[in-house]
Design a protein with these regions (language model features):
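Positively charged n-region of N-terminal signal peptides that target proteins for export
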Residues: 1-4
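Exported/periplasmic ABC-transporter solute-binding proteins
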Residues: 24-140
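Bacterial N-terminal signal peptides
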Residues: 7-16
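Alpha-helical transmembrane segments of integral membrane proteins
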Residues: 6-7, 60
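Sec/Tat signal peptide C-region and signal peptidase I cleavage site
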Residues: 16-23
Length: 140
């Protein structure tokens, strides 16, 4: 029984590591966003609803992927939450009237299209996805 448990834990840890290694994301913004780079703390503040602007004063509106490895990698890397905790914190903000839930879109192409056509929009997509018409922000 112990051996089976150890094998299960090892495989679970390996699969989580594999997902994190495969899911590399880039942060994109509408061309109206002044900054060419963004800090991890700015991203966390924007995507948790704590702030609606970057340090340079650019007003931004976050847009999300509905789910998947890239979504999970972004939340883990830049927000420090899993999807369940992330959505719960947003529901709390929405319920208390402090914020509106960010748009969640199906797929990288939809996120790129939305960000390209909406001033101040900021989102994330898979690193290998086409991203013409949007600005790629360097995360520092």
């Amino acid at each position: 029984m112990k051996k089976q448990l150890l094998i299960f834990l090892f495989l679970a840890a390996a699969s989580i590591f594999a997902v994190r290694m495969q899911a590399q994301v880039i942060v994109i913004a509408n061309s109206s966003v002044k900054s060419a780079d963004v800090s991890k703390s700015d991203l966390k503040d924007v995507f948790t609803g704590a702030s609606s602007s970057l340090k340079d004063g650019s007003h931004v509106t976050p847009v999300l992927l509905k789910g998947g490895a890239d979504h999970d990698a972004f939340l883990s890397e830049y927000v420090g939450k899993n999807d369940t905790a992330f959505r719960a914190s947003w529901r709390s903000l929405v319920f208390s009237g402090q914020a509106s839930m960010p748009k969640s879109l199906d797929g990288d192409a939809a996120v790129v299209d939305y960000v390209a056509h909406n001033a101040g929009a900021i989102g994330y997509i898979g690193k290998a996805s086409p991203h013409e018409g949007v600005k790629v922000l360097t995360v520092r």
